[in-house]
Amino acid sequence: METILNTQFDQLQKAIEGIKEAKSKGQSTDEARIATTLMFVALKHANREVKHKIKAGRDKLHLEKCKVDLSRLQLQNLLYEVSHLKKEIVRCQKFKSRDTSLELLSEAEYSSELPDMPNDAEELSSHKQHLHRLDCELRLRKALDKQYSALLSSKQELLQDNLSHAQRYVSFAPALRTLQSATKPLHDALQLSLDVEWKLSAVVKYLPKPLYVLFIVLQSLQRVSEEQSFTAEVVGYESEAQMQELLKEKKCSTLNYRQTKKESGDREKIADKNNLDDSLAPHPLHICLTIGAAGSNQLVLQIRYFDFIKCATVWGQLNCSRNANGQGDTNFVHHLLRHLYPNDLGNELPIPGIQYELRSSDLTAEECVRYLKAKDYGKPFCWLQSMCSIATVNSSMLYKHELNLNKNNKEIIDRIARRLNSWQRLSQQIRGLTFKDIDLYSLQENIYPAGLSCSLVQWTAITHEELHSQISDALNSSSADKGITYNSYRAVIVRGSAKMECFIRIPSNYPLEMPLWILNVHWNGCLTAQNNSAIKMMEFWTNSLQPKHLEPNDCILYAQLFRTIYSFDIFLETEGSMQNTIEYNKEKPYISAFAKRSRSRPYKYIKKGSVYAFKQ
């Protein structure tokens, strides 16, 4: 448009100059003036177009201005939001959640007691995981609070029940004394001495409650039993028990005084300086339980009670009339008590809530158990607590409170007596085999005396390393170790040029678990259960012997030995028949040396009437 206007202005200027020049020359200027006037019309039209374009430009400029103002307003809003978010970030950084002052569960307790995280736990942030954990712990605490309320109400009911029973017992005592005095003439007429029989020693009343209950039950069992299989007596001095009662009362008064000072606002910390010797001092009186008849080997159990840990312990020792143990296990009394019941090894304090009480004294249950063992006080077995009517919680968190004490204590004493008899017989067998003071041909376990061709030349004790150096499936597939220890022995059986080494492992929980035999035959090479199926079957046949397969009064170790000897004889006789030079002739009565398919040897002995033979 600017170019058009400039062109029109130039043309108009030229036309005016032409008119001026024509006018100066005296020529006619009408046509030129008309043409020039028409140029003004075009100029006017161009001027109008310029005005329209200026107006359109102004409108466009106003529109762009509005857009710029809107953008600036949005920018201000964004800047305000940024400043607000920064303030929120600072506020969040300074924020402290109230759960920081709470004592939350550890990771191990959380994984065991609370439910697992959802499947998309990996995608959750740490904050959301923490919120989930807090929610789970809240539910757990609510459940524990309900359980606490239920237990509290149950405790109140039991207290009311105990109070009513105590009132009944208090009212029953005068009536019983009246009845006793009224029936005394009848006792004298019938020459009864009931008051003398039931009169206890003066020292018994100073026993702690659990030992008192145990002693009374043992006395009742001793009176009703036909044979005197055990005796119980109280060991200790009455003066020491009285002195401990006085010290206990003084200590209680001191603790009450300290508690009063603490409640009155004294913030001084009073620490108990008693060490383990003072805290774990046993009661001066204890029970000595002797199991076994007089004149024979007797098991003496010393049962003590510890008021600090609220449980009883037992320490056992064997009183031998003669050295009957010999090369047997010298710690078999410890093994007998330790494996009397499954999963009751005595390595923990089975008292409910004792860990929390020990924690207040900066002690642990493990420290207490180690101290009791070091001082030869014994171990706190669960079966012993049940004999004393003490409530227990085992490692599986099972609560038990035995109330039928007569039946329970009689069963435990009978079990100890049976285990003691089994261990003594096993020790006698080991001694006889070690010192060779037995006649294998005359033993009742010898099922075929005429055919004993092999001879036992050695029986010695070996180390565990020597036993574990043997490679055997029977040794690898043995049960998992649950506090079980083993004694190992080596027996050598010889026949001609053949020799068999027997490695015997006797577990500490015998007779719950039978002795294990591992066999190695040295004849034309070294034959074991790993490289010879006949030796593997021989091992199985020896180890499959159980007490139910024996005759009454048979010894398990002798029976296993004879099974091994006869199996070795049959192996040599059947294997020797295939050799070029026959060294061992057939002496045992068997029908066939090998089975048709399995090629098994006739190790099994059968007898029907006067007919006996070995078969597969």
UniProtKB/Swiss-Prot annotation:
It comes from the Eukaryota. GO terms for molecular function: mRNA binding; ribonucleoprotein complex binding. One of its GO terms (biological process) is mRNA export from nucleus in response to heat stress. It is found in: Nucleus; Cytoplasm; Nucleus membrane. InterPro entries: Papain-like_cys_pep_sf (IPR038765), THO_Thoc5 (IPR019163). One of its GO terms (cellular component) is nucleus. Expressed in ovaries (at protein level). The modification Phosphotyrosine is found at residue 237. The keyword Cytoplasm applies. It holds the Pfam family FmiP_Thoc5. Keywords: Cytoplasm, Membrane, Nucleus, Phosphoprotein. The THO complex is required for cell proliferation and for proper export of heat-shock mRNAs under heat stress. Belongs to the THOC5 family. Component of the THO complex, composed of at least e(y)2, HPR1, THO2, THOC5, THOC6 and THOC7. Interacts with piwi; the interaction might be partly RNA-mediated. Interacts with CG9890. This is THO complex subunit 5. It comes from Drosophila melanogaster.
